């Protein structure tokens, strides 16, 4: 049974871990801010030593299709269509106004951003569905530019899902450095308005 001392100890342990994470992430953000693409490339090479660029090429995306089973490809296409339909229904309700009192009108209007960034987990937590669930709503909302970051090595299925979902740029970057790159921008990654 948990008592007050156990709770205090548990909170103190978590606070210590959080403080360590803050220091680590601050260092990563600073490295991306100062080192740009070079810092990103160095971090990516820890997981994929032969990487020469953080940007995934169109040839790599095309090659990924050849590595994905036809049934899986059909499943991704079907999932994209279903997710699209769901979010189209939401979009139909993206503007509403209601007069709550005479002369007082409340409402909501949804307006797409110009450029968004998506973080798609990888390695042991690689779920290509995350690519669809993040990119399709943005596409349906009318966001004209999407970039995605996913840690190396990237599963072919993830690349195919990102392509099916309409993502314009894919970068082999994971973790805090991916979020920093999308937020701050680098020599080759233009900053986004929302991640």
Q: Which functions belong to the PLM regions below?
A:
Residues 1-114:
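N-terminal Rossmann-like NAD(P)+-binding subdomain of aldehyde/semialdehyde dehydrogenases
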Residues 1-8, 159-170:
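Active-site-proximal helix-loop elements at catalytic-domain edges
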Residues 23, 111-114, 141, 165, ...:
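Structured loop/turn residues at beta-strand edges in well-structured enzyme cores
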Residues 26, 41, 80, 84, ...:
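Predominant activation on well-ordered alpha-helical scaffold segments within soluble catalytic domains
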Residues 36, 144, 168:
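Short acidic/polar active-site loop segments enriched in Thr and Asp
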Residues 82, 86-93, 119-122, 141, ...:
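Mid-sequence acidic-hydrophobic segments that form the walls
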Residues 97-161:
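Conserved small-residue-rich beta-alpha loop and adjacent elements
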Residues 166-195:
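Conserved NAD(P)+-binding/catalytic subdomain of aldehyde/semialdehyde dehydrogenases
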């Amino acid at each position: 049974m948990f008592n007050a001392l156990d709770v205090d100890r548990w909170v103190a342990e978590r606070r210590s871990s959080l403080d360590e994470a803050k220091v680590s992430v601050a260092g990563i953000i600073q490295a991306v801010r100062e080192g740009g693409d070079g810092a990103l490339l160095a971090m990516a090479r820890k997981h994929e030593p032969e990487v020469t660029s953080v940007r995934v090429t169109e040839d790599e995306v095309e090659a990924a299709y050849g590595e994905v089973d036809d049934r899986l490809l059909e499943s991704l296409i079907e999932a994209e269509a279903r997710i699209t339909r769901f979010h189209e229904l939401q979009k139909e309700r993206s503007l509403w106004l209601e007069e709550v009192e005479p002369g007082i009108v409340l409402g909501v209007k949804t307006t797409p951003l110009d450029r968004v960034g998506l973080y798609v987990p990888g390695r042991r937590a690689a779920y290509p569905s995350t690519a669809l669930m993040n990119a399709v709503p943005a596409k349906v909302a009318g966001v004209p530019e999407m970039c995605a970051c996913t840690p190396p090595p990237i599963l072919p299925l993830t690349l195919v899902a990102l392509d099916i979902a309409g993502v314009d740029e894919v970068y082999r970057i994971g973790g805090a450095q991916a979020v920093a790159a999308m937020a701050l921008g680098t020599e080759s990654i233009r900053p986004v308005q929302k991640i």
